[in-house]
Amino acid sequence: MTASLPPEVQQVFNSFLTTEFTTVDSRGRPICWPLTPYYDQGDPCIDVTTALGYPKKAEDARANPKVSLLFSDPTGSGMDDAPQVLVQGTADVDAQDLEANRKRYTREALVKLPGSKDLLPPKPLQRLFSFYFTRLYIHVRPERTSSMRASKSCGSRVGSPPGQTYTRSGRTWM
């Protein structure tokens, strides 16, 4: 579905440094986590990660794959007038090759957050922090995507033009 979205929405997925990732826990309560999204234009999914040492996000997404991503804060994205984008989708937790996930995370994080390079421990010591660098990837396949522009005054949407909603053909998310 992402390839059929407007380029500006795809740019939000690629450029934003954080997204609010929401899962539903075993008691039916929503839990929201700020995570860094990883996306390449045209990919079928938007990916987020969690450290192997902090698996709750992945466990909740595995138990109830209906998740959402809210792209609301463009800070650091270089997009001054970015729309806010809500993605409701289906999660797939990738824990098949943890070593490949660790390498991918290290590579992608340095591209997305180049300033983090100075904060990384030296490579030989990174193994001591495997609980953090070893990653579970959560692939979110959008089922419904909505975008709207926030008003400049206090973030209020009062008086803002209606947003756009895109739904994968023949699918319901609820």
Where are these regions (language model features)?
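Short, basic/aromatic recognition patches
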Residues: M1-E20
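Short beta-strand segments
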Residues: F16-G53, E59, L69-S72, P83
